[in-house]
Amino acid sequence: MSERPTGADAMVSRAKLRPREFHPYGHLVRRPIALPESVCKESVENLNQLLADTITLRDLYKKHHWQVAGPTFHQLHLLFDRHVDQQSELVDAIAERVQLLGGVSLAMAPDVAETTLIPRAPRGREEVPAQIARLLFAHEIVLKEARVMARRAADGADDGTNDLLVSGVIRTNELQVWFVAEHVVDMPLVHEESLEQAADRALSNFKL
């Protein structure tokens, strides 16, 4: 007679027997928050796109925090990590807003990688000018989409989403752009096209 699994083994066995989602991704749960379903649906879709890009930007900062080198190592090492913490707060706020509106927030790395508009960085270490250019490019994408999303949320009277985008996402990213750009004001940035052109190209297939 075989022994019945106990503890963690039992939990795994039960999970295998009942693998189901009680709230599928893309499905909206209605909540009594005095907003039309169509407005909630649009905000959820937009915020999930922004969530993917904010997670990617946060992780890009962490990569550069670990890999930065050169005479400005100490200052940038600390600055990048401070920005990681601030972006992490935005990630949490955006994801929770998605859930509040009745949606399902993106969470897993493969889903984020499939969704983000920010180009994937190489695995290896880059010089500081390339790191800075890559960060400013990512910020430009986030800011461009956040401004459009904020206007759309305001048009739908989704004041909570609009406030998050303006007071949280836009202001935080603007401030980080200032700190990063001014920190290396005398250092030439490395990029093949202007940041604005690159951001426009990345956003060209994203329809709001």
What are the language-model segments listed below?
Residues M1-L208:
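Iron-associated oxidoreductase/ferritin-like identity signal
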